[in-house]
Regions:
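A structural boundary/capping signal
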Residues: 1-247
Length: 247
């Protein structure tokens, strides 16, 4: 019994050393991503996955993403309206590909890891939204996740909208919105009604795109909430520390 106990203790120490090495590598990779000129959203999401799955092979994920992108691209053409583009993308992702939206549950950390969302074809609003935006980025569709409270909403902007140069109210440059959980489109009036139900006055901030860095920061913060048991305190602290690297 003593021998097995000592053996288990040694094994745990070895596992913690390996985990710490992986974590240090992940810290460095995240800093490199943060400081790079272009913050690729898929790469950022894969870094979050590698916290729990450090040996994750990325090639199958990239292949899955490319299959979806190509299926959508084949259905798109320059004559489609933005709403028609959204309908094509949502139809392929949520019907043909059969992506499902699930409620946020901190009991299921896999729902926050992009490779698991692709593998199991189900994700919560945040991960489905990130996947949707990745597709829009790859297809040159000007659609971004915005700052609507308690929701993950994708705004389809006018093709000439650029958040870095636009001076007016960003809502004026939005055609419509898509619910990341289901892929369904809805109108400005629907958003106005939502703010009324919250008794909240909408501001320009709510309609600005979230940066890729901000999205990955939020994703890390959400994953951290999955590790709130005493045995996982160190993981929660590490995830919060990673999130704090992103401003």
């Amino acid at each position: 019994m003593l021998f097995r106990s000592l053996s288990e203790e040694v094994q745990e120490r070895i596992e913690m050393i390996i985990h710490h090495l992986h974590y240090t590598d992940l810290q460095n990779d995240l800093i490199d991503w943060r400081d790079s000129g272009y913050h690729d959203l898929l790469f950022g999401a894969l870094l979050v996955s590698k916290f729990q799955y450090p040996d994750l092979p990325t090639t199958p994920v990239l292949q899955d993403i490319e299959k979806i992108r190509r299926n959508v691209w084949l259905e798109l053409n320059s004559f489609l309206t933005p709403l028609e583009q959204a309908n094509v993308l949502s139809s392929i992702m949520y019907k043909y590909y059969n992506l499902k939206g699930v409620e946020v549950s901190y009991e299921h950390p896999d729902d926050f890891f992009i490779h698991k969302v692709l593998e199991c074809k189900k994700g919560n609003a945040l991960t489905n939204g990130i996947l949707y935006q990745i597709m829009c980025d790859l297809l040159d569709i000007n659609a971004k996740i915005i700052n609507i409270p308690k929701q993950c909403i994708i705004a389809f902007y006018h093709s000439d909208f650029d958040t870095t140069t636009h001076i007016g109210h960003p809502q004026d440059k939005i055609h419509f919105y898509v619910d990341a959980t289901t892929g369904k489109a809805f109108s400005h009036k629907d958003v106005e009604n939502y703010f009324e139900r919250l008794s909240l006055l909408p501001t320009a901030f709510h309609f600005k795109p979230q940066s890729h860095v901000k999205l990955i920061k939020v994703l890390l913060e959400e994953v951290a909430k999955c590790f709130d048991r005493p045995s996982n305190d160190y993981k929660q602290a590490e995830l919060v520390s990673l999130a704090n690297l992103l401003k």
